[in-house]
């Protein structure tokens, strides 16, 4: 292991430990450097963090993240259940709104409003999931949730004077997570679906270090 290659390790660790992704499409200059560093020598970073912290660095197609450890205890199971339920809900809503939703697509608030206007079923889903009572409220909340989950990045389009939200590689993480979960029985599948609403989430900063 060449320790000279690990100069970004402390900053990246804090970021990944918060439940965040480091994506190829990142617009933040520091995160671009981090992604390039991981691409150049991710094995060294993975080995260093595994030895010093026990965390496992995993990578997908254009993104890196800390893989969650599932030990079989009830708390870990509840965390998986919460993640699975949240991911399914969000991905299902996005595909209801726009079946062409994918990595690289650029969305806006006006996109969200147009999709909601054209989809009464999605409106009912938003009425249940989000605060507020109008399509404008739900569009704002949807964008906020997409940013929370890091499904989108953001930048200001100066010509249109509108914030653009390009879809990041993290979206593929959620789809893959859902597609690769396999249940050994219908009872276990139901227990995941019925997991407590207040179960910890991958995106809670305070819980990430306990995985």
Language model: regions and residue ranges:
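Short basic alpha-helical hairpin corresponding to helix-turn-helix/winged-helix-like nucleic-acid-binding
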Residues: 58-114
